[in-house]
Amino acid sequence: SMPGAPFLYYGDEIGMRYVENLHSVEGGYGRTGSRSPMQWDHSTNAGFSAAPKEKLYVKQDEATDRPTVEAQMADPDSLYHEIRKLIDIRQAHSALQSRGEIEFVYAEEKQYPLAYLRSDDKEKILVIINPADREVSFDGDCAVKEALYTFGGEATFAGGKVTVPGGSAGFYLL
């Protein structure tokens, strides 16, 4: 929801994990664990290659619960589908795109939440992110038309206060 071009490193969309203790290949400088092969399915080598495991250039996450593209696509509540929702919302709302303006509404040092307004000549969208494990509030008088997206609970807007559940995020059309 920030200005600029969004990006995902391969595997982010399915929640691929950092694989510990992988041998650095070609000067990976400790980042090799982030560069393991894509995990397509639960077949041999996660569908990446039919080669014997010892022939793989970089080893894979061998955990039985490793996320795969196949499993994520089949689960409507998966991270993959959550990211698809976010992409669709960004594409549908010009204020969230690269040319949308940004104005910070609440951004206090060592405090949550982070709240900012994304706007253009067509719309205004309030973005609120609260990674804290507790509910937080800030002063704000907002006339919300619609919650475009919420994760972890919806903020409430009453009496000049915005109250945000712990571990939540939301996009609110004003």
Residue ranges and their predicted role:
Residues 158-174:
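C-terminal beta-strand-rich structural cap/linker in extracellular carbohydrate-active enzymes
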Residues 103, 135-139, 156, 161-163:
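Ser/Thr- (and often Asn-) enriched beta-sheet segments in non-cytosolic proteins
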Residues 45-46, 153-156, 169:
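A short acidic, often aromatic-flanked loop/helix-cap motif at beta-alpha or helix-coil junctions
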Residues 135-153:
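Beta-strand-rich binding/interaction modules
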Residues 128-129, 155:
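A conserved amphipathic helix/loop scaffold
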Residues 1-125, 131-136:
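Loop/helix patches that line or flank the sugar-binding groove of alpha-linked glycan CAZymes
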Residues 49-50, 151-152, 164:
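Short, surface-exposed secondary-structure junctions/capping segments
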